[in-house]
């Protein structure tokens, strides 16, 4: 197994290439180049190899620890024996068994990233850890920090109206349209007379829009034409304000005074008695 920083997600015993899962790789040789077959014997035709996978499965769990147990040792809490993809006539030695501990990738701080098999005479220094020995082959593992994969954003459909609002857009700015003009095509951005941009009516209900739209977004707002000349011509606007007469409080009370005489007279009348 080459140096890698990708966490290992699965370990298993595999007896042949035909039984090897698609996501697994078999370790068929030690670091010295010798056979990594765990079935030893004279004229032995069967074989058992160690396989590993780095492809996330299910809950995207990674292997955070590996232990080798004797046949009388109780399986620790949180650990599980590695899988087996063997021919029915082949079995692995039970005197020593490999077990692994798995955790979700987003919660694990470190995970097993590399496994090596060697002969007994071979020694590795840090950061490799010696796990144990089975059938004359020594297990070594290297752990590394886990970096959770960045989520891949799903492609979104951006309407032409939103593209028109982008500062990076190379499209030409559309001519100014008045509010009385017919509605443009759905999804187009319309520049208004007040310098702001609005979306057409159909674009408001387009669920593919990447921005949140409120109930009033896209409603055009324009100033009535009779007031446009007044605002643009400062001299006319100033003259209109000079002719404006502001009434005093007494003038307002005198103009809108109402004594409620009719109502008071009607309330003072005595209703006819019932005969």
From Swiss-Prot:
One of its GO terms (biological process) is regulation of epidermal growth factor receptor signaling pathway. A motif (SH3-binding) lies at residues 151-156. GO terms for cellular component: cytosol; ESCRT I complex; late endosome membrane. Keywords: Cytoplasm, Endosome, Membrane, Protein transport, SH3-binding, Transport. One of its GO terms (molecular function) is SH3 domain binding. InterPro entries: MABP, MVB12A, MVB12A/B, UMA. Transmembrane segments: none annotated. The keyword Membrane applies. Residues 5-145 form the MABP domain. It comes from the Eukaryota. It is found in: Cytoplasm; Endosome; Late endosome membrane. Residues 216-267 form the UMA domain. Component of the ESCRT-I complex (endosomal sorting complex required for transport I). Component of the ESCRT-I complex, a regulator of vesicular trafficking process. Required for the sorting of endocytic ubiquitinated cargos into multivesicular bodies. Belongs to the MVB12 family. This is Multivesicular body subunit 12A.
